[in-house]
A protein has these predicted regions:
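N-terminal Lys/Arg-rich, disordered targeting/topogenic segments
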Residues: 1-5
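A structural signal for multi-pass alpha-helical bundles of membrane permease subunits
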Residues: 6-10, 14-283
Length: 283
């Protein structure tokens, strides 16, 4: 009995330590957002201490930002770029995953090995070559070309995830569809793809967030101010921080720019976690 009580006591102490560590981690994660928001709401005369909460909340930076056209151009370009990236990557990766799942074992193994080698290569290594090709073919300042390029980088890993999910779908469904006269394409789009809705929704969210936050490729390939994404608008705002007034405006730009991503992730985080758990179990 004493041994049980001692174990319960140790368990309670352990839970308290977990709680304390969790609070510290949450504080560290939330602190940059607190600084970002409070700096964006400060008056020019209220920058003596940047750690404390502002004396008066000043919304002028947000009003000025939202009245201008630059941030809205950035939103439009980011939506086009992210949407196209999601569409291209989901379609190509799901079809590739289906082909790998239903293909011959030797061919699938060889392609998976090539995929793993591609995934292991850091994207920064191919940056110079990619940039040269895009210039040669006149594809700079082109959101569609940038979307294809971004999607191509994510297809190997995404198709691998789709393959694991499709492996859990009985082959008998394919055979029944073939007996009814359906071809490979019809079988995939009418039978298999609807079964992949949970992972498709989750992957679409993750791909969209990744494209929205993509900085390196848009920085090199989008030089036209009319083609800049939100991330590049934020970069431009911080590059002009010559004083406290400009810093407050830059923080306001950053807050508005990242807000859609945070809202989407908070609303759909349960689906994302459930899908990732399901993927690990199926894998």
């Amino acid at each position: 009995m004493e041994l049980i009580k001692e174990k319960i006591k140790k368990g309670k102490k352990f839970r308290w330590w977990i709680l304390i560590v969790s609070i510290v981690v949450c504080f560290i994660a939330a602190w940059p957002f607190y600084q970002l928001i409070t700096l964006s709401l400060r008056d020019v005369t209220d920058f003596e201490s940047r750690l404390r909460f502002p004396k008066v909340l000043v919304w002028e930076n947000y009003v000025t930002l939202l009245k201008g056209s630059e941030i809205w151009i950035g939103f439009k370009n980011s939506i086009i770029y992210s949407g196209l990236t999601v569409l291209i990557e989901i379609i190509c990766a799901s079809m590739a995953g289906y082909s790998l799942s239903r293909g011959s074992r030797n061919t699938t193994k060889a392609i998976r090995t090539i995929q793993m080698l591609i995934i292991m290569v850091p994207g920064i290594i191919t940056l110079v070559g990619t940039y040269s090709l895009m210039i040669k073919f006149g594809l700079t300042n082109n959101l569609v070309a940038l979307a294809f390029l971004t999607a191509a980088g994510g297809i190997p890993s995404c198709s691998f995830i789709y393959m694991n999910f499709i492996n859990s779908i009985p082959v008998s469904l394919d055979e029944a569809a073939r007996i009814d006269g359906a071809g490979v394409g019809s079988t995939f789009f009418r039978i298999i793809l609807p079964q992949l809705l949970p992972i498709t929704v989750t992957r679409a969210i993750m791909i969209g967030i990744g494209a929205w936050n993509n900085y390196l490729m848009p920085l090199y390939l989008l030089n036209d101010s009319r083609k800049k994404t939100v991330i590049l608008i934020i970069r431009s705002a911080f590059s002009m921080t010559g004083g406290d007034r400009n810093l407050a405006m830059a923080c306001a730009t950053c807050t508005v720019g990242i807000l859609p991503v945070i809202v989407v992730y908070m609303l759909l985080q349960r689906k994302i976690i459930e899908s990732q758990i399901g993927s690990s179990i199926k894998g």
